[in-house]
Amino acid sequence: VRVAGLQDQVRVGFQKPENKAGLTPKQQLEKIAQKTHALVKRQSSVYQELVYEQLKQQDVQVLMMDELSKTQKIFTQHFFEEHVFPVLTPVAVDAYRPFPTLLSKTMNIIVILEQQSEDEINEKVAIVQVPSVLTRMIKVPSKKGDTFVYLEDLIIDQINTLFYGYKVKTATAFRMTRNADLTIHEEGARDLLVEIERELKKRKWGAASRLEVRANE
């Protein structure tokens, strides 16, 4: 909420330094970004060096799609065809269809497509929402312990099946966090409860305050 409020101030051109820190909203955002990037880097290191290794010791592993055995690949393909493909709805983005409004903190995949015409290659963009009706961790058969793959990795692995006639140039998973700030005018609200309910519904569609992009392995 704090970051979203600062972003709102920058958006409207507010440049007055904040009394305690002596920094403008833009300068505060820059400081926050530096700190956040360092924290995310540390989080990744802790996962790789501690959590991931401890999971391996308990015979639990999360694999990339290219690390699966032939038998596991066959399983994931069948799982995709039976359970995932039926609930996927790709959305094209172009001059006539603007970028869709995505729910806060939902996992999505942005796909860059190429279509060959007689004289040129046309590039298009599509969005595929990772279905929330399915668990993100997909368990696959394993001779020892428990093995999982991420649902978004499985979708990306099979992404070509969604775009017949196109060549998939890139497919990248991302997640966006929206402004969850509540703006309630108590004095002008006839029914405070109704006003709160209205603002809570709007939180899902607030301005974007954070974008997380999955690194392509």
Task: Describe every region a protein language model picked out.
Residues 1-217:
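N-terminal non-catalytic structural scaffold regions of very large proteins
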